[in-house]
């Protein structure tokens, strides 16, 4: 269809061009002059009518005083920024616009050549007639860039200089003002009574154009049109590409008269949406074009048409001459040129609408100036033409206004596109290519500012005369209007018109403040940024009522109200959406706060749990520590108990033995009646006369009796001698006694030769027996110095080798009651008892050869006096005469024998002599500070000579023990310990007695009355069948005598004294009941008793180490060698 239209247009154009050539022939010279006047705007290919058009335009413009001057001079009123720039001074008269555009259109097309690439039909809603007219009026590229607003921008990159060929043709014919005048006359002649529009409707398909112009235009238009039809297919709406001006006119007529659907109108509406745009865009020219086309087509055959033209343009040869003819022409032209220059200098931005109006109104204000510019002979003709034109223009302007309103509606609908909202006007038009789109995100428009796209109203206003149409469009322009303010900044010309037009709608869509400057959506009711979502599309979709409306129909009030309501609803929904978003945000914030709180609580719970766990762990550790400590304490306690048990074990063992190891001890007689228990005692501690002894006290003797030592009370220091664990430990006992004593006691060596020993040990004859024995049992180094001994300053260990070879002792257990009084003497009341106690001695304790060396020196012819030897320690080999049968048969220890029994055994007189001598020696040894006490009491004072004894440990625990050879000499039987202080020639043995270490505690022993021999005394039940191996006797510590000094009060009690022989104080290192002292004689001759009986028991006081005898006994001179057992034997003492 487009092709048919193109062909028809070409044919009609050829016809028109032919008629135009005829007309042009008449005006050759005038056209040449007009061409010269046109300058660059006219092309040589353009025909005469174009030149006539320009000349006529100028002439008419000069004559018109009603703002109908073509905007060529001043561009009319500048459109502001809406039409691209003030370069196009636009006048309201579409006729003049059409004339100017018609004059320039073909020439511009020719100048562009094939460069014009956009067919008019394919430029939807982008060609306002005023724009194209003004664009055509401008020179050079101004005409090329005069394409309507957004369309020119949309296609500006590809086709920067595109004239509007369609409107150019229309404008060409419309610009021939003389044709209109001739048109009426020609119409009257050919078709009388038919008016321009009617003629156009009658001949809608006749495409009128001047012959020379049509070929050029058609050629230049068709080729680019075909080229550009494809690019514009997708983005832009397609309208029938027929470039002829007739189809728009036909469209307009058809749209106005829908009862006469013409092919052109149908073709114009092939594309529903672009067709209204195209028609509306071209409608402004269609009345003019129609009439002018009719005039062009109808009048060319008639010659009179050329005559008015020749008459019209006869005197006008150039613009220069026009200026010279017009008195104010220079001023007017200057004003117009100034506005054009300003618009050109503004970079394509035209001046504001006020400037446009001002340019056209200046002419109106000057008034009458046009007459001065016209020749006098043409005044009447021009006036007639003006009247005709005015009448025609009035009709055209009214039609144009209506069309402009519709066009404006369509354009404004495109000017505010939304991505998802398709206005019913152009459903196929993509949003990016709307002609009046304000914010096109895709395309840039270098030639025009965005504000230039917003002035459809200014186009319509300027396309019609200001004064004659009843518009109250503008005021008299002031100087401030020359500032060329932008469209959006000044809207003073947007006042309502007296006639209803589309401006009211324009004011509705475009408030006073610029859409360009104001953010979209603030002043515009539509969402220009496409912020509406799909949910709002139903509310913002105007297609239902817009598409149902014909393209040329006006928007009704109801539709506007619906639009407003939809927009309000949209904003309401938008508000609700925002509120929902805020609610969601608050909810999310609350959830986040709750999550944070929960996390905080969880963290706090974890921390609390960790602290609690740590506390539990700490408690557990503390409990484990306490438990471990408790276990450790229990272990220590267990160890202590085990240690104590081990310490007590030997005690128990010794208690279980009938006779334990020989331990020295003194038993204090604490009871008036001597009761000797049969239990075994392993150790005896001394008891004081004033307090009952604590036999289980194992504290060290030094600490228990610390600070209590004194000269008079030194016997209790014997306790210190026995505080040695070695006495209770079998290991130590074995170490001490399990072999050679030399190994256990390195300081002890047995005497090899008694005679040699006498010589070497002279001056150290005696050693305290208790010291030697304790040293013997306590590893030989317990008492290197006796701090409690006031008289002994040397260690007794040095004198240990001088111990008597034979020392015997026994223990008598006594009960604890009766402290301080000696118990009743255990006596042999009959010979049978005595014989039973000594029957085992028949076997002999030592072999005979052990005493052969001493036989010649020791009491020749007399038996060895053993007054206190144990039952099994008989010495049958000492003397050819065996001991008396009574003593042999008595099972009691000889230390318990009474004087009567001992008296029977002692028969030699020299023993008495020795006894007396020793008595004298002892008397001399009394301590000076104790002499008064001896005189008052008549007691012998001395360190108790507890003679060393030799008990065969092999019978119990001591495996190897050598028999001790007893020294025999002519000296006395014993030597007082005082002889230690000085060398004594009277003491050939120098070891007869051992001094008891000084003690801090005195034991008072009451010697009970002696019993008659016939009385039955306590029988000592001790095994006598045990054999004691013989061996050398070892002196434990030879240096003992050096550290010990014998007390001068020490005395030797005679064995025959019944009270003393049976009463003695027993000392033992372990808790024991009190034991009676055991008298031990070392080869002491037992003298016959001077007094067989002692009438009363005398109290016996043990001094530091002595037994105090009664004066009566001292007078008798009977002395008895008393032996203190340092360790209590497990002797079962029979009472």
Swiss-Prot record:
* Low complexity bias (residue ranges): 10-19, 36-50, 1058-1069
Q: Where is the composition biased (Gly residues)?
A: 73-83
- Cite a GO CC annotation: plasma membrane
Q: Which GO terms describe its molecular function?
A: beta-catenin binding; beta-catenin destruction complex binding; phosphatidylinositol-4,5-bisphosphate binding
N-acetylmethionine PTM positions read: 1
PTM-bearing positions, type Phosphoserine:
246
Q: Where is the composition biased (Basic and acidic residues)?
A: 23-35, 94-107, 196-208, 253-262, 282-291
Biased composition (Pro residues) is annotated at 238-248
Its biological purpose: Regulator of the canonical Wnt signaling pathway. Acts by specifically binding phosphatidylinositol 4,5-bisphosphate (PtdIns(4,5)P2), translocating to the cell membrane and interacting with key regulators of the canonical Wnt signaling pathway, such as components of the beta-catenin destruction complex. Acts both as a positive and negative regulator of the Wnt signaling pathway, depending on the context: acts as a positive regulator by promoting LRP6 phosphorylation.
| Comment field (misc) | Inactivated in approximately one-third of Wilms tumors.
Protein name, per record: APC membrane recruitment protein 1
Organism for this UniProt entry? Homo sapiens (Human)
Task: Specify the taxonomic lineage.
Answer: Eukaryota, Metazoa, Chordata, Craniata, Vertebrata
State the gene name recorded for this protein.
AMER1
């Amino acid at each position: 269809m487009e092709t048919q239209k193109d062909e028809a247009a070409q044919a009609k154009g050829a016809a028109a061009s032919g008629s135009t050539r005829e007309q042009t022939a008449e005006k050759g010279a005038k056209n040449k002059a007009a061409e010269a006047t046109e300058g660059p705007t006219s092309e040589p290919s353009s025909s005469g009518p174009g030149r006539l058009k320009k000349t006529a335009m100028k002439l008419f413009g000069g004559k018109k005083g009603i703002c109908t001057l073509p905007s060529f001079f001043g561009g009319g009123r500048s459109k502001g920024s809406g039409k691209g720039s003030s370069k196009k001074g636009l006048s309201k008269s579409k006729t003049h616009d059409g004339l100017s555009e018609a004059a320039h259109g073909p020439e511009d097309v020719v100048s562009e050549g094939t460069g014009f690439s956009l067919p008019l039909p394919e430029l939807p809603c982008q060609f306002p007639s005023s724009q194209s007219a003004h664009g055509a009026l401008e020179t050079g590229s101004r005409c090329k860039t005069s394409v309507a607003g957004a369309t020119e921008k949309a296609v500006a990159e590809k086709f920067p200089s595109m004239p509007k060929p369609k409107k150019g043709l229309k404008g060409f014919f419309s610009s021939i003002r003389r044709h209109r005048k001739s048109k009426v006359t020609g119409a009257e002649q050919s078709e009388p009574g038919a008016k321009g529009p009617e003629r156009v409707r009658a001949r809608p398909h006749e495409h009128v154009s001047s012959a020379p112009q049509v070929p050029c235009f058609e050629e230049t238009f068709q080729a680019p049109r075909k080229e550009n039809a494809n690019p514009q297919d997708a983005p832009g709406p397609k309208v029938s590409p027929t470039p002829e001006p007739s189809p728009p006119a036909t469209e307009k007529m058809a749209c106005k008269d829908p009862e006469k659907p013409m092919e052109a109108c149908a073709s114009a509406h092939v594309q529903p949406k672009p067709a209204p745009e195209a028609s509306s865009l071209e409608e402004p020219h269609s009345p003019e074009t129609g009439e002018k086309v009719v005039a062009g087509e109808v009048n060319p055959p008639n010659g009179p048409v050329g005559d008015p033209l020749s008459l019209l343009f006869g005197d006008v040869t150039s613009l220069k001459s026009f200026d010279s003819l017009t008195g104010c022409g220079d001023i007017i032209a200057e004003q117009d040129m100034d506005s054009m220059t300003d618009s050109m200098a503004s970079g394509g931005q035209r001046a504001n609408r006020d400037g446009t109006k001002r340019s056209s109104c200046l002419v109106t204000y000057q008034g009458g100036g046009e007459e001065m510019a016209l020749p006098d002979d043409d005044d009447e003709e021009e006036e007639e033409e003006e009247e005709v034109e005015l009448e025609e223009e009035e009709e055209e302007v009214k039609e144009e206004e209506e069309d402009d309103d519709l066009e404006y509606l369509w354009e404004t609908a495109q000017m505010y596109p939304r991505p998802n909202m398709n206005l019913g006007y152009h459903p196929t038009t993509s949003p990016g290519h709307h002609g009046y789109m304000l914010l096109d995100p895709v395309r840039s428009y270098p030639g025009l500012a965005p504000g230039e796209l917003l002035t459809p109203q200014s186009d319509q206003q300027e396309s019609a005369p200001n004064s004659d149409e009843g518009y109250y469009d503008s005021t008299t322009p002031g100087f401030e209007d020359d500032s060329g303010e932008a469209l959006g900044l000044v809207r003073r010309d947007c006042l309502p018109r007296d006639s209803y037009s589309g401006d009211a709608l324009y004011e509705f869509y475009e408030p006073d403040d610029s859409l360009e400057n104001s953010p979209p959506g603030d002043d515009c009711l539509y969402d220009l940024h496409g912020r509406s979502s799909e949910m709002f599309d139903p509310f913002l979709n105007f297609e239902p009522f817009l598409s149902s409306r014909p393209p040329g129909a006006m928007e009704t009030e109801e539709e506007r109200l619906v639009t407003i309501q939809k927009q309000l609803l949209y904003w309401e929904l938008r508000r609700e959406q925002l509120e929902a978003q805020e609610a969601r945000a608050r909810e999310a914030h609350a959830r986040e706060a709750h999550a944070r709180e929960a996390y905080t609580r969880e963290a706090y719970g974890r921390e609390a749990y960790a602290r609690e766990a740590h506390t539990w762990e700490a408690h557990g550790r503390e409990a484990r520590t306490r438990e471990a400590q408790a276990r450790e304490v229990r272990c220590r306690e267990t160890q202590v108990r085990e240690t104590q048990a081990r310490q007590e074990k030997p005690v128990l063992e010794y208690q279980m033995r009938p006779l334990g190891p020989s331990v020295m001890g003194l038993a204090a007689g604490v009871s008036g009646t001597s009761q000797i228990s049969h239990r075994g005692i392993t150790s005896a501690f001394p008891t004081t006369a004033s307090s009952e002894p604590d036999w289980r006290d194992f504290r060290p003797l030094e600490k228990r009796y610390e600070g209590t030592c004194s000269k008079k009370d030194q016997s209790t220091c014997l306790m210190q001698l026995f505080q040695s664990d070695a006495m209770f430990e079998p290991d130590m006992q074995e170490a001490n006694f399990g072999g050679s004593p030399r190994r256990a006691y390195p300081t002890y060596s047995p005497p090899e030769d008694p005679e040699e020993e006498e010589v070497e040990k002279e001056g150290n004859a005696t050693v305290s027996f208790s010291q030697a024995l304790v040293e013997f049992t306590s590893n030989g180094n317990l008492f290197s110095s006796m701090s409690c001994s006031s008289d002994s300053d040397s260690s007794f260990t040095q004198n240990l080798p001088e111990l008597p070879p034979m020392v015997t002792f026994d223990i008598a257990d006594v009960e604890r009651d009766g402290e301080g009084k000696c118990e009743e003497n255990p006596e042999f009341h009959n010979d049978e008892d005595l014989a039973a106690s000594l029957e085992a001695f028949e076997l002999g304790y030592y072999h005979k050869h052990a005493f052969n060396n001493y036989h010649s020196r020791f009491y020749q012819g007399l038996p060895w006096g053993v007054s206190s030897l144990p039952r099994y320690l008989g010495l049958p080999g000492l003397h050819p005469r065996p001991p008396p049968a009574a003593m042999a048969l008595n099972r009691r220890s000889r230390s318990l024998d009474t004087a009567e029994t001992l008296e029977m055994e002692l028969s030699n007189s020299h023993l008495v002599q020795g006894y007396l001598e020793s008595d004298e020696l002892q008397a001399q040894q009394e301590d000076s500070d104790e002499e008064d006490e001896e005189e008052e009491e008549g007691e012998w004072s001395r360190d108790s000579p507890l003679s060393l004894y030799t008990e065969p440990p092999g019978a119990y625990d001591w495996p190897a023990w050598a028999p001790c050879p007893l020294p025999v000499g002519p000296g006395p039987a014993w030597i007082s310990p005082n002889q230690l202080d000085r060398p004594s020639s009277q003491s050939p043995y120098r070891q007869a007695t051992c001094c008891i270490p000084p003690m801090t505690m005195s034991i008072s022993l009451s010697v009970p009355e002696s019993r008659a021999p016939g009385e039955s005394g306590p029988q000592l039940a001790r095994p006598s069948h045990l054999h004691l191996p013989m061996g050398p006797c070892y002196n434990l510590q030879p240096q003992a005598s050096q550290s010990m000094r014998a007390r001068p009060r020490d005395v030797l009690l005679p064995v025959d004294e019944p009270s003393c022989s049976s009463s003695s104080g027993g000392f033992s290192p372990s808790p024991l009941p009190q034991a009676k002292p055991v008298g031990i004689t070392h080869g002491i001759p037992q003298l016959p008793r001077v007094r067989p009986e002692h009438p009363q028991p005398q109290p016996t006081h043990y001094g530091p180490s002595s037994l105090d005898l009664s004066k009566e006994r001292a007078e008798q001179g009977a002395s008895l060698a008393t032996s203190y057992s340092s360790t209590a034997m497990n002797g079962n003492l029979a009472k």
